[in-house]
Amino acid sequence: MMEFNDIIRNAASLPTTEIAADVNKALTANGCVVLTAPPGAGKSTLLPLTVMAGFLPSDGKILMLEPRRLAARQVAERMADMLSEHTGGSVGYRVRFENRVSESTRIEVITEGILTRMLIADPLLEGVSVVIFDEFHERSINSDLAFALTRQCQQILRPDLKIVIMSATIDTSSICTSLNAPLIECRGKMFPVETRYATTDISPADIPTAVASAINKAHSQHEGDILAFLPGQADIAQCERLLADKLSPTAVFPLYGNLSPEQQRRAVAPSGKGERKIVLATPVAETSITIEGVRIVVDSGYCRQLVYNPRSGLSHLETVRISLDMATQRSGRAGRVAPGVCYRLWTKASEHRMNERRRPEISDADLAPTLLDIAAFGESDAEALPWLTTPQPSAVAQARKLLTTLGAVDSQNRITSLGRQMSKLPCHPHISKMMVRAKSPAQKSLACDIAAILEEKDPLTDDTSADLCLRISLLRTARRQHRLGRWSRIAQIAEEYRNMIKATECNDDICSEDAGCLVATAYPERVAKAIDSIGHFRLASGVNVQIDNGSNLASYDWLAVAALNASEKCGRVFLAAPLRPEDIETRQRERIFWDSKNGGVAMLRERTIGVLTVDSQPLHNADKSAVVSTVCEAVQKEGLGLLDWSDDVARLQKRVDAVAEWHPEMALPDLSTEHVLSTASEWLPFYIEQNGKVLTTAAELKKINLHDALWALIPYDMQQEVDRLAPSHITVPSGSRIRVDYRKAAEAPVLSVRLQECFGMLHTPCVDGGKRTVLMELLSPGFKPVQLTQDMDSFWSNAYFEVRKELKRRYPKHYWPENPLDAEAVRGVKRK
């Protein structure tokens, strides 16, 4: 094993040799250290070695987290080479599908998810002395989670554990303050990089063409290899086609995460003497990875970002603008070995619209996998962890709801036995539940195939079919024929999952509905029921989706949707399988509701999933209180029109309202329509349920005497006062009881009566204990108004004689006395 000074001497050209001793001293004195160094300074390769040299083997190993598998592999290989060893000796790495670690390994380079698994299995991290978080500026959700769990371990269980945060562009002030950690800076020896901006901004659709054009231009004007950054694999493939054979003999290499390790090694390997190459890369090449000979960077200015929609519960990839710190990382790749140039495919003026730093993924991501890991770690309160960026409470609530639905956590957010099994699988809880719940050997194998297909890029991207079973069949055919081709990575992942759940490979033909059953287990909220026209479905979550009309799946009544694109109006289904209704995990409920169409209460026993009803049967002997509540709610919703809303009811409301306004001190009950409706559940049940029978139809409800029901809301003594102050009728000289019209309380009550019935009436009637004079609306024999007055004495003495002339002319057969006060009042016709 090399000593500290030997390591420094062998790496004298690396700028971080100047700070290596300071880092070790800071680690001795502090629990956390923050370090910044520019790209190429040796922070990812030299410093872990010098830290190792400063600790005894008995102190424990060093874990270094890299955000990507490609970087983890290359960094480990480079450190091993610096020690004149092979990986698996003093330096090893663990990434998905690869493990180069032995008992003698002291530095283990791992990806973030692996550290989380280690902490869940051993919260003490026994045998580990230092945890290094490299390229921490990327702030992936896995990195933030791994840090929070490690920090909790350090604070509560392992105060001797050391944590190092490393980056080239991180916001050091906030992190140093949060961790109470010293900052060590390495200025590095970067060569100058000339930045050239485009004259116009490009759109995502123009990226492959614009990058190819810039590469052609740069290739002819500058020496050295070219590294171009594009958002995704499809952009790289299109750009590669545009460059095909045009720059020969310069070789063109793609570089992205889904390539095999051998393909990735070819892309980053140094060019031969006198040779040039072009590397078309996703952001995987932004950090840690060293591509020797690069002197030109072409930056599209875009990346692919997973965007989570909490309303739909779905995530989708979007092509978005990069942040300025990402642009700095990318341009730095051109100045590692010599002066370089960076072509930025955006205008200088547009940079003010770019974010200063990338937004932490935890602020926008689906938190369900994170919360399941936290529960498996033994923490039920996710917000209590020492986060650098605390997750949004709404996103936490959404994730907890999903985990509860999947049965992974209980109501106290504690992990269940099912959740414990799910947490052991390195995939989303949706997928892990599907594999854990698979029981038979055939189901287990099928679940592993489905998981692998969903986890990887769809090999049939040019195929419009959304049939998941088509993919499964093609995968199994490729395995049978030992001709995997484009299915090789999916087959590799499926095999890994089979090993994890102890399943055996199966290449038999499948039943489509069996696949649908497994998908529905994984995504219960994506069970889809056909609606409206062919190809349109509604998910159990309430989201509407559609599938191409030409698809063989479009005519099914039920589907289990495995992949889709979220949309506000109508999402698009990318992968699905048919589903039998009897295979759906449903909840049984008794639903009692008011059926407006049929005018009555409907009572059903239903099997449901989310907002969807799978099937229903009539419900007999329903709970009476529930039926009564349903009727009350219907009345509140549809109005008192469901009841016998007569003129008598309206007049009663007016009478009571008038007295209430005249005498607020009485505190009369409120009989306004709004209040009566809002309190229907308090007074209406007595009339709905009578003699053991509940009224359930609109016709039956019409039989309720609403006038008496509302009148009964007023205590008896108050009823008497209302009758005294605002009588419903007034008896006139003819003996008739005439109804009083109580209009607005500010207006006088009106008594509409035929003039002939008032002969002999000396004084105008009053209400409100004699305080308010009634407005007399005197009518002709034909019930037409002839006079309005509140002074009958004055009327008889004056206006009556003019009215009499007109009435004698119009009604000559009727009796119109000259002295009405002495005349007999009559109800009918009295001849002259």
Regions found by a protein language model. Give the residues of each.
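Short, surface-exposed polybasic-aromatic patches that bind anionic ligands, especially phosphate groups
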Residues: 730, 734-740
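Short, solvent-exposed loop/turn motifs
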Residues: 190, 544, 736-738
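P-loop NTPase motor module signature
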Residues: 1-434, 502-510, 546, 550, ...
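Phosphate-centric recognition/catalysis
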Residues: 749-754, 760
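Short conserved micro-motifs at the rims of enzyme active sites and ligand-binding pockets
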Residues: 120-121, 204, 309, 354-357, ...
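Acidic, serine/threonine- and proline-rich low-complexity intrinsically disordered segments
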Residues: 443-544, 557-729, 767, 771-832
